[in-house]
C-alpha cells in the first residue's frame, strides 16, 4: 500500500504543475495568478478544496503534448462560508484550450452544480476549442455547446453563476460570462470577443487591437457585456467573495447530521487490513469500522445474504446507509433441494467473497428501498468480481434478484456515493452504483481496478479468440508463441485496469488516499443537502 500511496503523491505533484514550471512562471510575469493559485486565494482561509478530476486527461493526447488535468481545475470549495463548485481554466496547458476531456470535465462540474443546487464560479482563461481536435469537441451533444445549454438551465433553476474573465475568453466561450448572473473582468489581462484580432483581420480586413476589440474598458463602458472591471486577479477574486457573502440561503434537503466523531478504531490500519493479493479473502467489516463515526455500525439482516454487508452508520456526523461487498468466504443457509428433505430444512452453502449471490441482491434491494423511505444517503463500497454464475445460481433466479437490486439502486432519489476499494468488475460495477448510475461522487483508492472482468480472465479469453483466429488462417502457434501472446495481452489489459486509467477518462472523480474517504463523502453529502428531494421514490415494475 505504501508504494501505491507514494505513487499517488508523485502523480499528484506532477499533475498539479499543469503545463510545467516555465509556463507557471510565465503566468506570474504577465501579472496573473495560476489557476490553482486563484482557487486557493478564492476559497475561505483554513478550508480545503475538494478537487474533482485531478487526473483527467492523464496519459491522453501524447501526440499533442498532453493535457494535464484536462487543462482545467474543478472541485468544491467554501467561498464566504458557501459551498460552491469552482471551475478555473489552466492557461499553462495549451493556453487553456478545450480538449475533448476538457469539455467532459467542465460538463461534470456543471452537473454537480445542477444536481446539488450549488453556486458555480467560472474563472475564465481559455483560448477556446483546441482546433486540431475540433471534431471531438464541437458538435455532439456532450461537447462544447452543452456548456451554454447548461448555463441556461442553471439560470432557470435559480442556481447562482459568477464568471470572472481573467485571461482570454474567445469565440463561443464569450457567451459564458453574459449567460452568468455576474460577469467580472481583470483589466489588462482579460479580454472577451467572438473573434480575435487575427480572425477579424482575415475575415473583414479590420485592424483592431485586443483591448479595443474586447478589453475590460470597452465591455464595461461601451458594450455593457461585463458588469465590473478590476485592476488585478486578487481584487477580482475579492469581489467574488463579496458577491457570495451577500447571497441568500436556499432550502435544504434535511439529511440527518449530529456532532461528528472520529472512528474509535485506528483508520491507518486500513493500510494493512486491505491485502496486497486481490484474490485473498478479508473481512470488509473491518474496513467499514475504520471509516465510520465511533466505529458504530447497525447491520441490516446480518445473517442473511452475507455476501453483501448492509447497515446504517454515520460519516462525519451524516447518517448513511452502507452497501458493501463482503470479501471473506461466508457460510450461508439456503433452501434445501426438493426430495427427501424435511419441511423447512436448510442446506449449507459456502459463498465466495466479492461475489453477489441472489440472497444478497435481494437483501440489498430491500435495504436501498428502506434508505429511500427514511431519506438516508447511500454509500456503496465496491470490491466486487460480479454476480454468481452456474446452474444453481441460474435456477435460483440470480438474474431477477440482480435486476431487483439494479432497479432499486437506479431509481433511488436519495444521493448515492461510490467508493471503489478493490475490484469493480462487470455487472457488479453496475449493481453497486457505477458511474452509469449517477453517484454524486465516485472515488477510487489506489488499490482499485475497473474492467469487464479481471486481467487474468480477460487475457485467457482474448488468447483463445486470437489463437482460434490464427489457426483459422492456417497458421501454427507454438506453446512459446502462445505464452508470449498471453503476456502481451495481459500487459495491455492490466494497463486499462489502473485507477488512473479510469480517472483519466472521468470514470471516477478522484483517486484518493483511503484516509481522505471520510472528507470526500462528508463534503459530498453536504453538497447534496443543498438540493431538496422533490421526486417521489418509485422502483417501477420490480421482479420478486
Q: In which residue ranges do the predicted regions lie?
A:
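Ligand-binding clefts of soluble mixed alpha/beta catalytic domains
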Residues: 1-544
